[in-house]
Regions:
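Glycine/tyrosine- and acidic-biased, solvent-exposed loop/turn segments at the edges of beta-strands
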Residues: 24-115
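Bacterial N-terminal signal peptides
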Residues: 11-22
Length: 115
């Protein structure tokens, strides 16, 4: 029984590591930015902020074309203008409003939908 418990714990740990690797590999490059507008880069070369040329999906958040977007230095979404209504951690966020996240991915703020 102890062997089964150990195998289960090991498989959970491996699954968690795999999930973390998948989410951290995802980082935006300058191709998502509107040409002719200011693109700010982090020291590591990843996009810090720019104006989007097209809608952009980041971890189930759809950011609006023409809107501003910003990323943390590890490539995680910091903020953007929502292209469509979104529900994040039970908060209903309004399209065309700014949404922002903490570096750990938790919702920081958004424009709430009208009830």
């Amino acid at each position: 029984m102890k062997i089964i418990d150990n195998l289960f714990s090991l498989s959970l740990a491996l699954a968690l590591i795999l999930i973390l690797v998948i989410f951290n590999v995802y980082a935006a490059d300058q191709s998502i930015c509107n040409s002719g507008t200011t693109v700010v880069l982090h020291d590591n070369g990843l996009v810090k902020s720019c104006q989007l040329k097209d809608d952009y999906d980041a971890n189930n958040i759809r950011c609006k074309n023409g809107g501003s977007v910003s990323f943390y230095s590890d490539g995680k979404l910091e903020s953007c203008v929502l292209s469509a209504d979104a529900t994040v951690a039970e908060s209903k966020c309004k399209a065309d409003g700014l949404i922002s996240f903490y570096i750990d991915g938790k919702l920081k703020s958004c424009m709430k939908q009208d009830n």
